[in-house]
Amino acid sequence: MKKSALFLLIILLAVVCVAQGDHVPAYNHGPLKPGDALPILPRDQWRGEAFQYPYQVRAYELAAEIPDVIYQMPCYCYCDRIGHNSLHSCFESTHGAHCGLCMKEVFYAYEQTMLKKTPTQIRAGIIRGDWKAINLESVAKSH
């Protein structure tokens, strides 16, 4: 029952956030400076209610593989309103595990990175909404 309620909450949040309009949320216009590093939530914290589904864990694994890319991506859950400055910010805490939009965007960014797309090209796809086609249940199994 808790899993169903959490899943419905994620879906509801996604629907509400998508309706926010055409504003492009905050993102960084270039990569991290050499020597700088931003942490993804440590693996030993990937448990509990925020990590009940395989796609939640997989989203964090992918975020850890492409931190420089997601640092340059906007996040359409509009978390810039709570101080986030890019999609990367979502995966520095459990925020990304609670938000279907964040997870879809990180799966999309990873797929496009594997296709050798540049961060600029990936960002354009995110702004177009290409990430909306991601199915979290099926994509987690294929990565």
Predicted segments, located by residue:
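Short, flexible, mixed-charge glycine/proline-rich loop motifs
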Residues: A64-Y71
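Secretory/periplasmic and organellar redox-cofactor proteins
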Residues: M1-A64, Y110-H143
